[in-house]
């Protein structure tokens, strides 16, 4: 198994900052935004974007934590650990995840969202888009596009969970 670091902590911070600026530029009413981090690492990324929005725009944007496992078609988990601090009805939701791959996690996240309320709009921000979609889903905000083979894996590590800020490609061969 080979591991190659492709994004370090500085590059990751820049990508998150770029996503934050794009969110500011594309959303006329920032007061209507709710960030929804997809567990696990998407939550930490959402909190970082929330912090940058506070620094740049002096806004306190709510952050929810979406558990997609009960909504996936490839596993069955009974307990839903989703937390959403506000009613999402008529809100502009920005889903945040670490890696966009097949699109199945995002589909499950959207199913979870609509079980909570009826947002006016849902968009998607991801740190890494690696391609290989199985569903017609695309990200609105992308930190980095990193094409991979289907055999490779992308490993995102964040300081809050893993002790490092980095992204690596794992080649199992």
Swiss-Prot record:
Q: Which reaction(s) does its UniProt entry say it catalyses?
A: UMP + diphosphate = 5-phospho-alpha-D-ribose 1-diphosphate + uracil
GO biological-process terms attached to the record: DNA-templated transcription termination
Q: Which CDD domains match?
A: PRTases_typeI (cd06223)
EC id: 2.4.2.9
Gene Ontology molecular function terms on file: RNA binding; uracil phosphoribosyltransferase activity
Q: List keywords of the entry alphabetically.
A: Glycosyltransferase, RNA-binding, Transcription, Transcription regulation, Transcription termination, Transferase
Which superkingdom, per the lineage? Bacteria
Q: Does the keyword Iron apply?
A: no
**Classification via Pfam families:** Pribosyltran
| Gene3D superfamilies from the UniProt entry | 3.40.50.2020
Query: Where is the motif (PRPP-binding)?
Result: 93-105
Q: What does this protein do?
A: Regulates transcriptional attenuation of the pyrimidine nucleotide (pyr) operon by binding in a uridine-dependent manner to specific sites on pyr mRNA. This disrupts an antiterminator hairpin in the RNA and favors formation of a downstream transcription terminator, leading to a reduced expression of downstream genes.
Q: Could you say which protein family the record assigns here?
A: Belongs to the purine/pyrimidine phosphoribosyltransferase family. PyrR subfamily.
This protein's assembly is summarised as: Homodimer and homohexamer; in equilibrium.
What protein am I looking at? Bifunctional protein PyrR
Q: Which organism is it from?
A: Streptococcus agalactiae serotype V (strain ATCC BAA-611 / 2603 V/R)
